[in-house]
Curated annotation (Swiss-Prot):
EC number, as in UniProt: 1.1.1.90
Task of the protein: Oxidizes primary alcohols with an aromatic or cyclohex-1-ene ring. It is highly specific for benzyl alcohol.
A Gene Ontology BP annotation from the UniProt entry: formaldehyde catabolic process
Record-linked PANTHER family: ALCOHOL DEHYDROGENASE, ALCOHOL DEHYDROGENASE CLASS-3
Subunit-structure text: Homodimer.
InterPro entries given in the database record: ADH-like_C (IPR013149), ADH-like_N (IPR013154), ADH_Zn_CS (IPR002328), GroES-like_sf (IPR011032), NAD(P)-bd_dom_sf (IPR036291)
The name this protein goes by in its record: Aryl-alcohol dehydrogenase
Family as reported in the entry's similarity comment: Belongs to the zinc-containing alcohol dehydrogenase family.
Top-level taxon of the source organism: Bacteria
Coiled coil (residue ranges): none
Binding-site list for Zn(2+) 2: C90, C93, C96, C104
Catalytic activity entry: an aromatic primary alcohol + NAD(+) = an aromatic aldehyde + NADH + H(+)
Keyword Oxidoreductase included in the entry's annotation: yes
């Protein structure tokens, strides 16, 4: 079928809106008409080849839409369902079978390499040339996408569907890093480095978790103001104050839970050094490939736990509907992070995101 998609054809290149041909759904696939799609930092990192994915490619991995058709083996959703599209996992490796799909051993290819699970190219341009697709099992910078049963999450119809796409990645990552991975007990303290969409989602999740001290660290005052509005009890601007010293003025021994969302190695070092003995430091920010940080191993030896977190360690079929319900109850107001753009202004949305003008751009598609 003919669809419209935003294609990146060269490193650092623009998103080009083109009419392309999309395959019919295979037996395990779902054809989704996109209503809106979030634009995520990972889309831009891959566009610019900091992660070397093949080009040309249709990116987009925070899709929300309506099921149009399903393959013969699909049972979880049916035409007319409202869905959020998230990351692909195989469902058959040890990690998936153990209930930890974010550690899937077979997820890299289907999420990043531009082909379906069976190795097919699912999008061709008007000249018949292959265009990479199936990005995160969806490629949702398009009017329609092919997803899989495993990365298609059914959601309620009584919440605006155009809001929900970012729950598939960025917001799920921030909230899940707190609620699923770090899991701080009520009454505890957490420091969150970086107050972008992921970091502010973590702030809101810390409120849900019952943390009584929530420290947000960022160099942009407008983001810190929003962090306070969303529940941060303390804000620190590293441009004005050393964040390690500022945190230790609040907690002399450091904080028990720390989350680093910026992807900047120097900030990760600050996050580690802000932690208490026995503390846990989660890393979700995506630095350039090969980035390293200098850390005194003896500092970590004192029962500190340094861990990477993928997609908030979420089981999306469970976690995304929970976030939707928290939003419905007014306990997780992630809509305050979102700014909408028409699909044909995708390049402006990307520029605004890179400049920090917009926290979470969402493209209205159909």
């Amino acid at each position: 079928m003919e669809i419209k998609a935003a294609i990146v054809r060269q490193k650092n290149g623009p998103f080009l809106l083109e009419h392309v041909a999309l395959n019919e759904p295979a037996e395990d696939q779902v054809l989704v008409r996109l209503v809106a799609t979030g634009l995520c930092h990972t889309d831009l990192v891959c566009r610019d080849q900091h992660y070397p994915v093949p080009l040309p490619m249709v990116f987009g991995h925070e899709g929300a839409g309506v099921v149009e058709r399903v393959g013969s083996a699909v049972k979880k959703v049916q035409p007319g369902d409202h869905v959020v599209l998230t990351f692909y996992t195989c469902g058959s490796c040890d990690a998936c079978l153990s209930g930890d799909p974010t550690s899937c051993a077979n997820s890299f290819g289907p999420n990043f390499m531009g082909r379906s699970v069976t190795g097919e190219c699912t999008i061709h341009d008007h000249q018949g040339a292959e265009v990479g697709a199936s990005f995160f099992g969806q490629s949702s910078f398009a009017t329609y996408a092919l997803s899989y049963e495993r990365n298609t999450v059914k959601v309620t119809k009584d919440v605006p569907l155009e809001l929900l796409g970012p729950l598939g990645c960025g917001i799920q990552t921030g909230a899940g890093s707190v609620l699923n991975a770090l899991n701080p007990p009520a009454g505890s303290a957490i420091a969150i480095f970086g107050a972008g969409a992921v970091g502010l989602s973590a702030v809101m999740a810390a409120v849900v978790a019952g943390c009584t001290t929530i420290i947000a660290v960022d160099v942009k005052e407008n983001r810190l103001e929003l962090a306070s509005e969303l529940g941060a009890t303390h804000i620190i601007n590293p441009a004005a104050n050393d964040p390690i010293e500022a945190i230790k003025e609040i907690f002399a021994d450091g904080v028990p839970y720390v989350l680093e969302t910026s992807g900047l190695p120097a900030v990760l070092t600050q996050a580690i050094l802000s932690s208490a003995i026995g503390g846990e430091i989660g890393i979700v920010g995506a630095p350039p490939m090969g980035a390293t940080v200098p850390v005194d191993i003896n500092f970590l030896l004192f029962n500190r736990k340094l861990r990477g977190i993928v997609e908030g360690q979420s089981i999306s079929d469970i976690f995304i509907p929970r976030l939707v319900e928290l939003y419905r109850q007014g306990k997780f107001p992630f809509d305050k992070l979102i700014k909408f753009y028409p699909f044909d202004e995708i390049n402006r949305a990307a520029e605004d995101s890179e400049k920090g003008v917009t926290l979470k751009p969402v493209l209205r598609i159909g």
